[in-house]
UniProtKB/Swiss-Prot annotation:
Keyword Transferase among record annotations: yes
Family: Belongs to the class I-like SAM-binding methyltransferase superfamily. RNA M5U methyltransferase family. RlmD subfamily.
Domain called TRAM: residue spans: 10-68
InterPro entries registered for this protein in UniProt: 23S_rRNA_MeTrfase_RlmD, MeTrfase_TrmA_AS, MeTrfase_TrmA_CS, NA-bd_OB-fold, SAM-dependent_MTases_sf, TRAM_dom, U5_MeTrfase_fam
The keyword Transferase is annotated on this UniProt entry: yes
Coiled coil: none
SUPFAM superfamilies, per the entry: Nucleic acid-binding proteins (SSF50249), S-adenosyl-L-methionine-dependent methyltransferases (SSF53335)
Residues annotated as the enzyme's active site: C389
UniProt-listed Pfam families: TRAM, tRNA_U5-meth_tr
Main enzyme class: transferase
Protein name: 23S rRNA (uracil(1939)-C(5))-methyltransferase RlmD
Organism (species): Citrobacter koseri (strain ATCC BAA-895 / CDC 4225-83 / SGSC4696)
Gene: rlmD
Binding site for [4Fe-4S] cluster: C81, C87, C90, C162
Amino acid sequence: MAQFYSAKRRVTTRQIITVTVNDLDPFGQGVARHNGKALFIPGLLPQEKGDVVITEDKKQFARAQVKRRLNDSPERETPRCPHFGVCGGCQQQHASVALQQRSKSAALSRLMKCDVAEVIADTPWGYRRRARLSLNYLPKTQQLQMGFRKAGSSDIVDVRQCPILVPQLEALLPRVRACLESLQGNRHFGHVELVQAGNGTLMVLRHTAPLNATDREKLERFSHSEGLSLFLAPQSDILEPLTGEAPWYDSNGLRLTFSPRDFIQVNEGVNQKMVARALEWLDIQPDDRVLDLFCGMGNFTLPLATRAASVVGVEGVPALVEKGRENARRNGLQNVTFFHENLEEDVTKQQWAKNGFDKILLDPARAGAAGVMKHIIKLKPIRIVYVSCNPATLARDSDALLNAGYQIQRLAMLDMFPHTGHLESMVLFERL
């Protein structure tokens, strides 16, 4: 009689190798060389040696996981946050701020084939004036989770503190948690958003089921005791103000009101310096006509209008156009106009573009401005400032300007998000 045996499961032992890191990529990963290609290792810094296991091996690069760090770089820091390494918010708290800035500047310089002239930075801690915290009720423990997502996961890290938040928001975290835990409807909460505006703190609560009268009363009492403005979001496209006043923030001496859903730069200090540097680079003269593309609600547009003869702000989101017009009225600026346009279309054919522009500023989203560059070139401005949140699309769009006879005069790295992998920048182009 034949006897059959099941094949033994093959056990693969991953080889441990020892490598020395010689670089840090902009995402905070150590970079070593192995078998003639780049090896990316989270957790190791330049000058550090470690025993690592390769977890992914591609043709052009590989990834590895640290098993043991054999020495410490002089630029290694003790992370301030107890959640670092688990929370997906920060990737570089283990590296000195100087090292973070050097690695990001080097990556930007390589992409742009141009030296970074300056790093525009502010305080590296307590800088974030906006935070969205996920909420999740756990029936077994009857507890409410409140925090940020884990790195590479939808799981929530229960956050008790966050040292990159502005101090007012970090101090508020335990009290917000206690308030929300006490509500009867906390099984139906999606997230809570906190924003530190110029006139105080605002809070937005996303809930997926109606709040009863008791919960609404508790929330109102909480908002009054904390002195914050409270908004409820029963649906993703509905915002109900419950207490407080409309928020605003300062931009180069002007007051800009905004809705809790509007985009604002989360780093107030760097935003102020960025706007000031843009005005300086463009060298605005009293007779200049200036165009601001992807203008939002006027973060750059309105400060430009304090110096130029006239400014046109163009934006693809109608609500932001209305907010820009409102902010111009509130600040008494009569030489600025806002228009809602599809920025992929030829804006040079619009009535407001007939007289041309001396200077142009653009601040697009991560996708960049590929469809807009040819129209900018047709307008033939003397100077262009491009503010970017994605160096890859910035490099692509810059090629169009360089091929049209513009030159890069200044390149700056904006340290808008210290301790993270986000790299922002701004470039000054000048027509030859």
